[in-house]
Amino acid sequence: MQQIPDHNALAAIGQHPNEAMPKLRVRGLRAATALAFLASTGLARAGEAEQPAFEFYGQLNFGIFHVDDGQGNDTYLSDNDNSNSRIGIIHQTELANGHRLKFHFESGLGFSGSAAATLDDNDLGLKWRRTELRKLEVVYSTPTYGRLSFGQGSTATDGVAETDFSGTGVVHYSSINALAGSAEFHTVSGAGSGTTINAAFRNFDGARRFRLRYDSAPYNGFGLAISAGEEVLRHGDDRDYYDLALRYDRDLDQFKVSGRIGYAWAGSDRSTVASSIAVFHKATGLNLAFATGRQQDTGADYAYLKLGLKRRWIDMGETAVSFDLFKGDDLAGIGSQSKSYGLGIVQKWDRYDTELYAGYRNYELKGASVAVADIDVAVIGARWKF
């Protein structure tokens, strides 16, 4: 996964963000929060550990977006949902024998995001909702037996479709719907088709949920992750979620290589498989990423390919450029074809911990009941990390 992607890729499951969460789940989340923090402080004292350390971090990431759906267009300022603005706190304690205990909180700031913007509703606003919560977990790590995580956070398959060395993930990666996911395709007569970019372009990557997760210690570059959990931030989803993933990471003399594959079960009627691989050539900066996924119950699938070049041409910082292609079948319904291509450039400004970026993407949908026009999206923006 793009590491800070919002990913942002979770689909709403029938609840308005301001509706009350079921009391049982609210209490469960609060109890987990208290347990996590007490564990991270209490066990530290019991284990004769070093003094615990706090780390505060965050980012602001805004872009100017121009969207043209073939019938109208608009330009607006929005939070970039490829990697939304956020803040986080880590409380970490080193225990004996290399063991480590960590409490991790992370939340979006609540700015209106690019994935929710439409041509009719795209004003930049600020309204925090509980769905902004990204991480609220306690993590216990050991050098030999791996890592155990409990609370709101990444499931085992989060990131399996998003392995990427390009350095352009802030402007485009395999979750290509994040730039303008709520934009609707229109017919040549100007009528809305009822199909949005979100519906026609998905990468089947995993999500963040309230879960128990185990990650094995790496062995010759390989690692295994498994998780079980449920959705507690959105009302109306009572399914149990189970995820299993295999990862591979190697840093070789000339190349860096990463691969991911994962299988996710959502209740008894839906399962998805997704995978990705990325290669980076150190001497030239050339890089490649490939991802694919399939929803087992519907047969919907896709393939994604990205080519990039990352070099330090100027003293300001590293420059990354990339081009990608996406092709999906049956994502918007049986017989539909979703195609997209995109360009991106990111310039790092090391002195100010900032990335300046620009990108363009074309979305094409064929095979629907009626012909629809392409949607074009362009963006320029900046991400500042602190």
Predicted feature locations:
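Short loop/turn motifs that connect adjacent beta-strands in outer-membrane beta-barrel proteins
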Residues: 45-54, 94-101, 144-145, 220-221, ...
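Transmembrane beta-strands of outer-membrane beta-barrel pores
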Residues: 62-68, 107-111, 154-156, 228-232, ...
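Transmembrane beta-strands of outer-membrane beta-barrel proteins
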Residues: 54-62, 101-105, 148, 222-226, ...
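Residues that define the transmembrane beta-barrel architecture of outer-membrane proteins
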Residues: 75-85, 131-134, 206-210, 238-242, ...
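Outer-membrane beta-barrel architecture
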Residues: 88-90, 137-140, 213-215, 245-247, ...
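Detector for outer-membrane/organellar transmembrane beta-barrel domains
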Residues: 241-343, 348
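Outer-membrane beta-barrel "beta-signal"
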Residues: 2-5, 9-14, 244, 374-386
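Outer membrane beta-barrel
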Residues: 48-66, 76-231, 238-240, 248
